Amino acid sequence: MGDMVVEPATLKPTSEPTPSPSGNNGGSLLSVITEGVGELSVIDPEVAQKACQEVLEKVKLLHGGVAISSKGTPLELVNGDGVDNEIRCLDDPPAQIREEEDEMGAGVASGTAKGARRRRQNNSAKQSWLLRLFESKLFDISMAISYLYNSKEPGVQAYIGNRLFYFRNEDVDFYLPQLLNMYIHMDEDVGDAIKPYIVHRCRQSINFSLQCALLLGAYSSDMHISTQRHSRGTKLRKLILSDELKPAHRKRELPTLSPAPDTGLSPSKRTHQRSKSDATASISLSSNLKRTASNPKVENEDEELSSSTESIDNSFSSPVRLAPEREFIKSLMAIGKRLATLPTKEQKTQRLISELSLLNHKLPARVWLPTAGFDHHVVRVPHTQAVVLNSKDKAPYLIYVEVLECENFDTTSVPARIPENRIRSTRSVENLPECGITHEQRAGSFSTVPNYDNDDEAWSVDDIGELQVELPEVHTNSCDNISQFSVDSITSQESKEPVFIAAGDIRRRLSEQLAHTPTAFKRDPEDPSAVALKEPWQEKVRRIREGSPYGHLPNWRLLSVIVKCGDDLRQELLAFQVLKQLQSIWEQERVPLWIKPYKILVISADSGMIEPVVNAVSIHQVKKQSQLSLLDYFLQEHGSYTTEAFLSAQRNFVQSCAGYCLVCYLLQVKDRHNGNILLDAEGHIIHIDFGFILSSSPRNLGFETSAFKLTTEFVDVMGGLNGDMFNYYKMLMLQGLIAARKHMDKVVQIVEIMQQGSQLPCFHGSSTIRNLKERFHMSMTEEQLQLLVEQMVDGSMRSITTKLYDGFQYLTNGIM
């Protein structure tokens, strides 16, 4: 199937009816829904036409109007600028309608007829205003999702499905979980309206395809496999994972093919099943190329080889373009599962380094990190920098990933592999090979069809046991090294206008910076992540870049990701969406609250990836490492009370604390111990781990009954109960709540749509949505809201249950 450029329908009201090109037989043009779209099959014109006819016929029958002709006469909504301002057939003159109305009204009192006409005109006016709304600049993606979810009229749903093409990709991507959940769990009319857009975007973006496939699988997991709705979601997922949605332009951009040596077609048997990279540029034209299923298993070397190439036209990529990326992700998940079986943090850390060292043997490859916001190829994982995070029962881990940014992931060649021990005598990019990776390098890349059901075949335990863990590399900085990284770090000092700064101010700021350099944490075998997380991000990037064989490349970037196995991140994704929406609302209303939503990738119902918050450590780690109170730690890190650094950090703390207090109140966030609250280098607090929100709580203990967590230590950092910053905190709380309730519908619909068909614990109980709406207090005046904020702050600060829960976490998990 080719990649079509879809021109979606426009819904423009007209002052006068437009005759149908097909005469009285109806034809295929339905200007309300499918203008300019019928030939491209975005929405089936006959389906949309029939839907609108049924809707309008129902309206006329209910209000004493004329039944629509059974011949399928096209209909058009008039925008209300005309005299009649009513819904009518395109080919029927208004006089005919009046004559038929007179006939139908025979024997009926004139008052009743006038009432029917008035109701019909009112309904026409409503239809006209709906059209005006859909075409106005006020109609944003949030309103489109709302109408798609709440409307019961197929014609409206079909139009909204077409309207999705007009919004920016990033705006629609934000609501992708809602769109796919509606596709899975709602009726066919909604699904039929959504599917054309999803298919079109999947042709355009491989990352969008991956996210759709993962979300469809995760949100279908709560349904019985035999149900029709589940099979419908499964069919779309299989379509995405197949090769049918691959962009057609790949066939036009094939590299030159040349026969490969025989050794390239007969790889030796090895434990790690490796096939040719999806970037293979040399394929034997005489080879027997077999087509494989969307997710086949490796049975032998011949099948593995044949699966690595589907046809000459498709040789630019793997037969299933998502297969290498899926193997990359599943390899990371398998590492987490194996780490969870080890008893100590030290053993987990050693095993993690060994596993990632093996993973590097398959890189570079046509794989990417889905949490990143730009196109790139993964080239290396600095395995010695990975750390295991704190968890009692599981083994989440943090890795850093070196990538090379590219313009287009699909068409850019996979970078050539550079050996770890290569002496980089030059930094010139021109000296690097421009072609794809060689045969030896391809042998170490990701198989396109791994056997996911047998970890021993995909990753050899024997190999891991024999692997010698590499020690951190020692590098000597050459002059060109220094010059390269100096250029990267220098910021432009040019300014259009001169800026005069007093010499005393410069001396004071320099002395403050030298006197209060951020402290480093000590290595703790029981908490190896503390040191890694405390290191400033820019320093980490510089250090890893200097030790990387790819670090000299100008498009080199460093990313990080947390891999979690055994945790359902669907609630985390829901919380991310709510936080992102609240952040947008507060920015729009100019309320200086600060929150930090971090990206979530749901891989399955029990695994996923999380974007780490850089330059931040947990309050638990702060207290354990420093043995100081929170206020004393602020003074140690940022200077005395009167320094500019401390005042800035204090303001950041207040603005972020107020923002997260409102988030915790609205979403009823639980499990708020100090291990789940981070403190960054600028003084902000960041709440993490939203596994218990709305109707769920840890082990249903019910410890945390306060509106949010506000401890005495937090108030001390703000300057005490009588301080100006504490009053500023309460003022921000009030302003933030007032702003949030102005846009309540935008927040509530995110949660309400995801409740459809969900078995998540946060939706247990029938009153989840009602209680969420009540927490916006729409009926209260601003004076009443101010009193409410005062009561919540006072109650949270004095809450005995918060102290009990902190004590419980200290006794059971050692969290300070």
Curated annotation (Swiss-Prot):
Ranges where the record places region Catalytic loop: 668-676
EC number, as in UniProt: 2.7.1.67
InterPro entries documented for this protein: Kinase-like_dom_sf, PI3/4_kinase_cat_dom, PI3/4_kinase_cat_sf, PI3/4_kinase_CS, PI3K_accessory_dom, PI4KB-PIK1_PIK, PI_Kinase
Region described as G-loop: spans on this chain: 541-547
Reaction it catalyzes: a 1,2-diacyl-sn-glycero-3-phospho-(1D-myo-inositol) + ATP = a 1,2-diacyl-sn-glycero-3-phospho-(1D-myo-inositol 4-phosphate) + ADP + H(+)
Biased composition (Low complexity): 10-30
Region (Interaction with ACBD3): 2-68
Compartments, record wording: Endomembrane system; Mitochondrion outer membrane; Rough endoplasmic reticulum membrane; Golgi apparatus
Domain PI3K/PI4K catalytic span(s) in chain numbering: 535-801
Region: Activation loop, residue numbers: 687-711
Positions of post-translational Phosphothreonine modification: 263, 438, 517, 519
Residue positions where N-acetylglycine is found in the record: 2
Domain PIK helical: 52-242
Biological processes per GO annotation: inner ear development; lysosome organization; phosphatidylinositol phosphate biosynthetic process
Membrane topology: Peripheral membrane protein
One example GO MF annotation: 14-3-3 protein binding
Cofactors demanded by this protein: Mg(2+); Mn(2+)
Start and end residues of each stretch annotated as Disordered: 1-30, 101-120, 250-318
Amino acid composition bias (Polar residues), ranges on this chain: 278-297, 306-318
Regulation of its function: Inhibited by wortmannin. Increased kinase activity upon interaction with NCS1/FREQ.
Phosphoserine: modified positions: 258, 266, 275, 277, 284, 294, 428, 511
GO cellular component: Golgi apparatus; Golgi membrane; mitochondrial outer membrane; rough endoplasmic reticulum membrane
Protein task: Phosphorylates phosphatidylinositol (PI) in the first committed step in the production of the second messenger inositol-1,4,5,-trisphosphate (PIP). May regulate Golgi disintegration/reorganization during mitosis, possibly via its phosphorylation. Involved in Golgi-to-plasma membrane trafficking. May play an important role in the inner ear development.
Protein family membership: Belongs to the PI3/PI4-kinase family. Type III PI4K subfamily.
Protein name, as recorded: Phosphatidylinositol 4-kinase beta
Organism ancestry: Eukaryota, Metazoa, Chordata, Craniata, Vertebrata
